[in-house]
Amino acid sequence: MLTHKTCQARKKMQVSFVIRDAEEKQHRNGVNALQLDANNGKLYSAGRDAIIRVWNTRTDSSEKYIQSMEHHNDWVNDIVLCCNGRNLISASCDTTVKVWNAQKGFCMSTLRTHRDYVQALAYAKDREQVASAGLDKAIFLWDVNTLTALTASNNTVTTSSLTGSKDSIYSLAMNPSGTVIVSGSTENILRIWDPRTCMRIMKLRGHTENVRCLVVSPDGNQVVSGSSDGTIKVWNLGQQRCVQTIHVHKEGVWSLLMSENFQYIISGSRDRNIIVTEMRNPSNKTLVCEEQAPVLSLGYNIDKTGVWATTWNSDIRCWKLPMYDRCTLNSSGGMDAQWTQGGTEVACIKGGAAIKECAVLNDKRYIITKDSQDQVVVYDVLRVVKKEQLGAVDYEAEVKKRNKQVYIPNWFTVDLKTGMPTIVLGQEEVDCFSAWVSIEAGLPECVDPTTEIKINYGKLLLEALLEYWTPPHSIPPNEMEPDMHGNGYFQVPKHTPVIFSEVGGRTVCRLLVRDAAGDSESTLLHETAPQWVTDVVIEKNIPKFLKIPFFLQPHPQMTKPERTKKDRLVANEFIQCRKVCEHVLEKVLNAETTPSGGNANNSLQNSQSDANSEGSQLPAEERIELWCNDVVVDPNMDLRTVRHFIWKQSTDLTFQYKTKQNFNYDGK
């Protein structure tokens, strides 16, 4: 017997997975941050689809994709390149900060210090120091050389924290020498610390809404801030005041980029505009471009003649920057200053479509989605695959056409936050073991016509997701018995990411289906998988059946009713109404039946009875008619479907029965 080491005993856990291709070369949602390695022309992009991608900006080809860096399972909000491009640090809504080998693209370590979304990072190049901040109001300082030296055995890291923030932090900046760190938050103020001593220096007031972006001058004397209030402010830290307020945008300013001499501001806004402004003379400004969606981040190209921009959409575009020419001769012989031509799109990294709408069909196996390009797709949740690409068809009409009159309890939820369908299994509001179905309905391709088997969707799926997991210290299988892995019916794609996380909280474990066989992954699963998962995957326990109470009484049109009282019965909710017909014949009318399992009373309790035993020539459903709410019930309907579509009441389901005209129960 395997002894399961319960982890997070006080935390309720959920399991989620993403239905996706083995390699997703395009961003499937907005892109939150950019970092350019100018030495080798690599552009790193942090996606809302939870993936960091690397692009070759030196090629003129449309195929710029190099590789993906995957280990987050929620939006990647910020990234910084460090150690001369050897390493990358990322911050995510999954509450983690991750350290990456930027060249090989793998995650080296995960920092779990934050307790909420990590929104921003700051980097002091000269000191190799990184700061992280987020919605938990915390700021942590990290020594990059220590982080990159972490190993499985040497996995202890210390951090300094900057205290005093009273609200969620959305922006963070340091100068290269690491003498000043500035944070912006929903307090609408700037807080300044000395990261060398972790001492608070000052706070600056002036913005009226969230401070979304910050840049600190190299000497640490000036700060430029952008806010949701639509303004850009320039602050002098020596004077501890705002020395310039710039109004060039109609909506919030979400991204800032400074020229090397700290004289020009390139700003991106929710109003979709990218604008260059002279800091000392804000009236001297020019529009670089109008993007297709609100601008999330900006970054220079290699020679700084253009700027890469990301938005709510998944495309990444590079725009030519206009230059400010002060040496233009005017008609009077004097010198004029003017902007040279800019705003031309010089490169584009195309993104993919994000799923925006999703409908779970009544069979609770398939979902239909509609993406940002109006493409409609059918996904098979149970097999974790895309089933059918329908194209730009009428989404609502497809949902209506494919919905059958069948009721199966919800056993999963769908999250579209990343732009790809993430399926969530749990034991809270939605019980992943609530969906029992007959095998001919759930897996018609696996039907054995000689048996009537009930399957549980949640159990089968968990067994498939963790098929390769062999827990440490488990007892080897008996040589006479097969080593049971998986569910015996189907497998899911091996590249599928599986995530264990706290309900409404942080990620505990992420792995691919195929990697569960690894020693470290197996040990991690053993320590983190909740008991309700190991019960079905390892112990092979059967989830409990859900019961439905119902009343059974004669129909008013019964010519010779044996009784008039109501009988209150309880049966598994997936029992078909033909079983109720058999019960009426055998137990109520005492007629000969063609039972579905020998004893009609047992048929109400046992879902796996045999429907082919010998008996009377006519089956029960051809001799007995069931009514509910003045509607004749299809004998193939199960109890839960009748309750949902016909009964439609919170009180106990009530059936009325009567004999059909061609059957006289007195004449046996």
From Swiss-Prot:
Record carries keyword Repeat: yes
Record region (Disordered): 592-616
Keyword entries, A-Z: Repeat, Ubl conjugation pathway, WD repeat
Sequence ranges of the WD repeats: 26-65, 71-110, 113-152, 164-203, 206-245, 248-287, 290-329, 350-389
A Pfam family recorded for this sequence: DUF3337
Assembly, per entry: Catalytic component of the Usp12-46 deubiquitylase complex consisting of Usp12-46, Wdr20 and Uaf1; regulatory subunit that, together wtih Wdr20, stabilizes Usp12-46. The Usp12-46 deubiquitylase complex associates with arr/arrow; the interaction leads to deubiquitination and stabilization of arr/arrow.
UniProt name for this protein: WD repeat-containing protein 48 homolog
Species name: Drosophila simulans
